[in-house]
Amino acid sequence: MHRRLKILLTNDDGISAKGMSLLVANLLKADFADLYIVAPATEQSGKSMSFSYTQPVSIEKVDYPQPVAGAWAVSGSPVDCVKLALGDLFRNALPDLVLSGINHGSNAGRNIFYSGTAGAAMEAILSGVPSIAFSQEQHISFFQEVHAPEILKKLSLYALSMPFPILSGFNVNFPASERNEEWKGMRLVTTGKEYACGMPKLLVDDGKRKFFSLSDCQIVMDEDISDECRTLLENYITVVPLLVRNSPLALISETKFQQLQEAFDNFISSASGATLLD
């Protein structure tokens, strides 16, 4: 008999977000884990790894519209959610894995440094639990559910197949196809150099104070685009390692990364990763 996994779900778009609902729905279809949600009560995008250092946060058990094992809403950031889940709710029996997302928009390239979705995953990793951050390019409506249960299961099992902390987490971005073409597959790549940039937009100037919006951002790309960006444009799912031996990915050699790519390709193309649950 295979052991069912215990998976903690979180995000930065809020517990009621469409991306969370899609993640839950497709994990339920895959049917290999018991799901627990601890997510922000409200939108927390752009929070990175910030946490509520100077003020208390609350956590409340809520009824979730899908059949999960339990769900809680937190008044703080994505990192607050992970801290409360691992340090209080599940401190006596930690989850096997933390999945964060599915984010409404890209977290490819340097956007990862702003991302609350990725911040939650990093907090889990630093706390000793493997984690994956998921994001959908452009808009959550581009997410394709046809093969999603299999993809989510394989990525989860792959994350657990690596001896912690040799390779302890991933940042995954799903491509957006303008013609709704099916994803071509998955590729392990390094973080791209592209980033979101925009000028502050003045909303109100009352003579004493000015109010700005910082949300008007566009992706900045060089002519020499990164492997991550090119892979997404070619309609492949990108899988980027977050930490290798608790060190930034940039510190490992090209040869070592090629070995990681080969191991990833072999695992994903194998018939099943079910033996990991024995």
UniProtKB/Swiss-Prot annotation:
Cofactor binding summary note: Binds 1 divalent metal cation per subunit.
Source species: Chlamydia abortus (strain DSM 27085 / S26/3)
Gene Ontology terms, MF aspect: 3'-nucleotidase activity; 5'-nucleotidase activity; exopolyphosphatase activity; metal ion binding; nucleotide binding
Cofactor(s) in the UniProt record: a divalent metal cation
Listed name of the protein: 5'-nucleotidase SurE
Keyword hit for Repeat: no
Keyword rRNA-binding part of the UniProt annotation: no
Main localization, broad class: cytoplasm
Keywords tagged on the record: Cytoplasm, Hydrolase, Metal-binding, Nucleotide-binding
EC nos: 3.1.3.5
Protein localization: Cytoplasm
Domain of life of the source: Bacteria
Binding site for a divalent metal cation: D12, D13, S45, N103
Stretches that traverse the bilayer: none
Reaction(s) this enzyme catalyzes, per UniProt: a ribonucleoside 5'-phosphate + H2O = a ribonucleoside + phosphate
InterPro entries associated with the record: SurE (IPR030048), SurE-like_Pase/nucleotidase (IPR002828), SurE-like_sf (IPR036523)
Biological role stated in the UniProt entry: Nucleotidase that shows phosphatase activity on nucleoside 5'-monophosphates.
Similarity comment text for this entry: Belongs to the SurE nucleotidase family.
Enzyme class: hydrolase
Gene3D superfamilies in the cross-refs: Survival protein SurE-like phosphatase/nucleotidase
A cellular-component GO term for this protein: cytoplasm
